[in-house]
Amino acid sequence: MLTKRIIPCLDVTLDASGGTVVKGVEFVDLKKAGDPVDLAKRYNEQGADELVFLDITASHEGRSTMIDVIERTANEVFIPLTVGGGINSVEDVRQILRAGADKVSVNTAAVKNPEFIREASNIFGSQCIVTAIDCKRNLDVENNQDKTILELEDGTLAWYEVVIYGGREPTGLDTVQWAKKVEELGSGEILLTSMNRDGTYDGFDIPITKKLSEELDIPIIASGGVGNPEHMYKGFVDGKADAGLAASIFHFGEYTVRDVKEALRAKNIPVRL
C-alpha cells in the first residue's frame, strides 16, 4: 500500500479582512473557522501532506479567486497547495499557479466545457490539474438504466449524479462515467465529494469512493463526512482512496492532523509522520 495523504481542506469565502475559512453542513449554514493563512500554517506544523483551498463562493458569484490569500499562504507554507473555485480559463490557472499554488482544482467549468481539462493539462501538465467532482445519490434507478447503479450500505440501489455550482445544480451526469472522461482528458487527480456526507461526521461515502478507486488509474482524494480517524481508515481500506480530505474535524480542534496520522499508523496504514 502506498503512503496515504491527509489533506485539510479550507473552504474560504472572501470578506473585508481578505478571506475567512468557513465550514458548513452540505455547503449551507456556514460557520466561521478562522483566518486561512493562520490555519494553513497550523496544519503545515501538524504534518499535513497537502492543503486544499476552495473559494466556495467564487463560481456562484462569478468572482475571480483570491490571489492575495494564495500568495500569503505560499510564503508561509511549504507543502503542496491546491486551489479551486471560480477557475474558468487557462489564464485563471496561470494566475493561481503563479501566485504560488502547486495545483488547481476545476469543477463547474470542467462540466460546462470538458475540453478545458485537456487544454489546461496540455499547457501546465496533468500533475497540476485536479478535477473536483461533487456528487449526490439519486435513488431513481428505474429511469436511469444507462447510469452506473451501485448498492448502498443499506442495500438500496442508487446512482451518483454530478452536481455543480457548490452542489446547487444537478447535471444529469453519472459520476463514474464523468470521472472516466476526466481521466481521459488529462486530469491528474480527482477530488470526490459526496454531498450526502459533506459536513455530517458520518464518514466517507464508501460505495462511490470504492467504485472510482477501482475503475480509475489516477489518484482519488475522498472528501465529505470525516468525523474521526476511523472514518479516514475506512476511506483507505474500504474505499481504497489514495488520500483523505477533511475540514471540520481539524478546524474546530477536535483532532490534529498528527492525531489522525498516529491513529492510522497504529492500524498499519502507511502515513508520513
UniProtKB/Swiss-Prot annotation:
Its EC number is 4.3.2.10. Its main location: cytoplasm. Pfam families: His_biosynth. The keyword Flavoprotein does not apply. This is Imidazole glycerol phosphate synthase subunit HisF. It comes from Methanococcoides burtonii (strain DSM 6242 / NBRC 107633 / OCM 468 / ACE-M). It comes from the Archaea. It catalyses: 5-[(5-phospho-1-deoxy-D-ribulos-1-ylimino)methylamino]-1-(5-phospho-beta-D-ribosyl)imidazole-4-carboxamide + L-glutamine = D-erythro-1-(imidazol-4-yl)glycerol 3-phosphate + 5-amino-1-(5-phospho-beta-D-ribosyl)imidazole-4-carboxamide + L-glutamate + H(+). It is an enzyme of class 4 (lyase).
